[in-house]
Amino acid sequence: MASHCSMRVILLRFSNGVSSRSILNSTNHRLLSLTMTNTLSSLSSISPHTTTSHFTAASQQSDDQNCFRKLQLRKISISTPLCMGRRSSKIAGRKGAQDSKKAKLYCRIGKEVVSAVKKGGPNPVSNTTLATILDKAKELDVPKDIVERNIKRASEKGQEAFIEKIYEVYGYGGVSMVVEVLTDKINRSVAAIRSVVKDYGGKMADSGSVMFKFKRVRVVNIKVTEADKDQLLIIALDAGAEDVIEPPTYEDDTDEDREERYYKIVTSNENYSTILSKLRDEGVNFEPDNGSELLPLTTVEVDDEAMELNKELMQKLLELDDVDAVYIDQK
């Protein structure tokens, strides 16, 4: 690659939860230019083949355009929204939310283990479903004792397999929520969810009336203190990620708040393991979670009162043992 050429990483804003992946230039999007002279050291670990496949090198504009047409230049979207004076919108607190998410992950993996053992037995050699779950648990650093405990639990008398259910809810201010459940007692779970929604002012929605507002993605969450943003972008590009979402900032953030922010790498099912491997190779720690989330296609802005009420409703839903996750399209 010629020394005078520049390599651009196009960072397109993840606007309202929608990835604007087809836009190459826009005044509404943040553009980051990485020049070869400034990034040779950062790119030293990337092979020539990988560099060629992900970046466009050219000395003239016409050559750039030809390369854009010939190569699939991957565009990584990233946003840095500033939330002015709305500290109350930090749903359950960033650290608390991550701790809760980790606990929910362990619980869900345990449920999946129970279901797999109930259906195919405790031997992962003959039970491919269990083998897949065990691989996932290892990949996500789920403690071994949790897995072993739930393998034993599956053989207990009266223990039933777990079933996945989705419940859709309307919150305050036109906000929608999706509640993911993995339960061995459907009647118990729906009764508990309906009770919480009613008690905290929400409304149960008909099936399908909310889900279309979200999209399912594979994600990797990385604490901002664990990696430099530019480093993450290089890793994401090299591993075939689709987007990198930068966490929101608040004007009244404390140092502790800033340390509890997380980047979110969005990728496909096929590239998910590759992303994790690349992060491990680079010594970047990531948060163990199930790697699957619902992101809103658009977001709804509400006033402070509605925001607090939605926060309380979400918290109460997440306190239910059968509930694994709650997703919201609130801005």
Curated annotation (Swiss-Prot):
Pfam families: TACO1_YebC_N, Transcrip_reg
One Gene Ontology cellular component: vacuole
Protein name (database record): Probable transcriptional regulatory protein At2g25830
Gene3D superfamilies named among the record's database cross-references: 1.10.10.200, 3.30.70.980
Record-stated family: Belongs to the TACO1 family.
